[in-house]
Amino acid sequence: NAVANTYTLNSDFGSGVVVAGAGFLLNNEMDDFSAKAGVPNAYGLLGGDANAIQPGKRMLSSMSPTILLDRDGRVAMVVGSMGGSTIISGVFQVLVDVVDYRMSAQQAVSAPRFHHQGTPINLLTYDGAFAPASLAALQQRGYTVEPHDWPLGDVQLIVRTQAGWDAASDPRGRGEVRRLP
C-alpha cells in the first residue's frame, strides 16, 4: 500500500490568515484560477477562459502526487513536490533520473533541474550546476537560458530497491527523511 500526499498553501504563508484557535494557515488557491484571460498569476502562468472562476469549480493545479508501479503492480516509487508551476518539471525529472538514469533517491532529488513555463516559448530556466556546454547547446538551438529566481521544486521521494526502500528529501527545501521501524 502507498499514499502520495501533497497539499499546498499556494504561495508562502498562503493567504496569510491563521485559523483562530487552530493555528494553521489558509491557502490562497484562488490564485490558481484565471481571474482574467491572458493575465499571469503569481507564478507567471497565463490563464484562459477554461480556468475562469465559477461556482463549484475546482481550479487547475500543478500538484502531482505520483505513485509509480512496477511491472508486477507493486509500488516502485512514491514522489511529490511543492513549487507551484515548477512541480510538474521537478517530479518528471526525478522520475526520469531514477527510471532512465538509475540514480539513487538522493541523487535524483539533488540533481540540477530545468523548467519551461510555456511562455515565452523560447525561455528555459534552470536550478543547479548544468554543464556550460549543455547550456550553450540550448542557446544554439534558440533558447534563452537563465537561472530560475527561486528553487525548482522541493521533491520528496521514496524508491523500492533490491535492498528495500530508499528515501530522500530535496536539499532545495526544508523537508527531511524519517525512516520508521
State each model region's role.
Residues A129-P181:
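Cofactor-centric catalytic regions
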Residues N1-H148:
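Proteins synthesized as precursors that undergo proteolytic processing into mature forms
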